[in-house]
Design a protein with these regions (language model features):
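An acidic-aromatic loop/edge-strand motif
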Residues: 3-42, 96-156
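Short beta-strands within extracellular/lumenal beta-sheet-rich domains
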Residues: 38-51, 88-90
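Residues that act as N-cap/strand-start positions at coil-to-secondary-structure junctions
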Residues: 40-44, 56, 67, 84-86
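Aromatic-lined ligand-binding clefts that engage carbohydrates, nucleic acids, or primary amines
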Residues: 48, 54-76, 103-107
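Short, low-complexity Ser/Thr-rich regulatory SLiMs
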Residues: 50-52, 94, 154
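A short, polar/proline- and glycine-enriched secondary-structure boundary/capping micro-motif
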Residues: 72-75, 92, 114-116
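Short hydrophobic beta-strand segments in globular cytosolic domains
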Residues: 80-81
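A short, polar/charged loop-to-alpha-helix boundary motif
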Residues: 84-96
Length: 156
């Protein structure tokens, strides 16, 4: 039915870091402090091949698996929606074509990890501040990013 390209290009908007990875990962577990303490939006790009033209009676969904905290999905530059609750899935029927498709997923996490990094002298980028009281006494980093696994589902 489909075949995904072997890698993702991930660009972190606030600090302009770009990574290429074979697998999805939790930003808060990354060794690079600019990624581990990152808060904001990162864009994942990859391609996949769809073998058949979608049937007019089918609805095709991209299932994102685990996401921290919200995601906007685009297929072939068509906005397929923003998702912030389970199930993390987007209807991509109207954007999908037979052959190679471009997939772009913007993922945004909370401000908590950047605030923790700034408190520890490990800010992932400049300009991190808040005028709100901290509500997290614990300094453990929160999971962040697109963890997947990505899959497709079809309904008729």
């Amino acid at each position: 039915m489909y075949k995904r390209q072997k890698e993702y290009t991930i660009t972190f908007a606030a600090n302009k870091k770009t990574l290429t990875r074979q697998e999805l990962f939790d930003w808060s577990q990354e060794s690079d402090e600019q990624i581990r303490y990152y808060s904001g939006t990162a864009t994942y790009k990859t391609t996949f091949r769809w073998k058949n033209k979608p049937n007019k009676d089918q609805q095709i969904y991209l299932n994102l698996g685990t996401v921290y905290n919200l995601a906007t999905v685009r297929v072939n530059s068509v906005d397929c929606g923003t998702i912030w609750t389970a199930p993390y899935r987007a209807n991509i029927t109207g954007a999908l074509k037979k052959g190679t498709n471009e997939l772009e997923i913007e993922v945004t996490n909370t401000w908590a990890n950047a605030l923790t990094g700034a408190d520890e002298g490990k800010a992932p980028f400049d300009g991190i501040w808040t005028n709100a009281k901290y509500r997290r006494a614990e300094k453990t980093l929160l999971p962040a990013g697109l963890l997947g696994p990505l899959s497709f589902s079809i309904t008729e």
